[in-house]
């Protein structure tokens, strides 16, 4: 089984998360996408972060597709770092083929993630374009360091079968929604 992993705060979850997941299911020929709702992002201020259970419940409503599963795994296993989560999943579910899914905005700062090289060495990565962030993302330190492992977009459907490091930059999905844009100044969620 081929599983896409989409990690995030989901504060709040929104239609772009769903659109990215459906896009990845199709373009990467995945069987499922798991939304890994994090207890807290180590690179962000978590002061306005809603309760994990509230974010997971909202994510289930937004996902609205049986191929998208919502998980609070990081809370269960007691980690907040993607590298540790991926190591755990690879040990516990070695028969599954995982692909890490991220937006171009995350590729632009991927070099700041704990053990980012380890993540890239453990699972293939699919980066979904988020204009106008394309240029910055593709010229970021991690993108430059991993340039020789980039897979042609035409071969994206076979990414899950490739040994890491391997990554693809997917274009064609145009969604400008962001969780930041859906939060009020006090941290409450706007209607969506």
Curated annotation (Swiss-Prot):
The family database entries (SUPFAM superfamilies) matched by this protein are listed as: Nucleotidylyl transferase
Q: Name one Pfam family in it.
A: CTP_transf_like
Question: Does the record carry ATP-binding as a key word?
Answer: yes
Catalyses which reaction(s): nicotinate beta-D-ribonucleotide + ATP + H(+) = deamido-NAD(+) + diphosphate
Enzyme class of the recorded protein, top EC level: transferase
Keywords from UniProt, A to Z, are: ATP-binding, NAD, Nucleotide-binding, Nucleotidyltransferase, Pyridine nucleotide biosynthesis, Transferase
Q: In which pathway does it act?
A: Cofactor biosynthesis; NAD(+) biosynthesis; deamido-NAD(+) from nicotinate D-ribonucleotide: step 1/1
Keyword Nucleotide-binding attached: yes
Family to which the UniProt record says this protein belongs: Belongs to the NadD family.
Protein's name according to its UniProt entry:
Probable nicotinate-nucleotide adenylyltransferase
Encoding gene, per UniProt annotation: nadD
């Amino acid at each position: 089984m081929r599983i896409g992993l989409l990690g995030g705060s989901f504060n709040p979850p929104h239609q772009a998360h769903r659109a990215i997941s459906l896009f990845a299911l199709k373009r990467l020929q995945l069987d499922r996408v798991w939304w890994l709702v994090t207890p807290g992002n180590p690179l962000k201020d978590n002061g306005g972060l809603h309760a994990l259970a509230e974010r997971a419940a909202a994510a289930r409503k937004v996902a609205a597709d049986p191929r998208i599963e919502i998980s609070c795994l990081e809370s269960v296993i007691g980690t907040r770092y993607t590298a540790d989560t991926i190591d755990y999943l690879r040990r516990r579910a070695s028969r599954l083929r995982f692909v890490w899914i991220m937006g171009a905005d995350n590729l632009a700062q991927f070099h700041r993630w704990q053990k980012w090289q380890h993540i890239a060495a453990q699972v293939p990565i699919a980066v979904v374009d988020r204009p106008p962030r394309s240029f910055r993302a593709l010229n970021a330190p991690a993108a430059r360091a991993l340039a020789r492992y980039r897979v042609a977009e035409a071969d994206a459907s076979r990414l899950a079968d490739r040994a890491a490091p391997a990554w693809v930059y997917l274009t064609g999905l145009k969604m400008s929604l962001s969780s930041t844009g859906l939060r009020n100044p006090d941290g409450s969620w706007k209607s969506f």
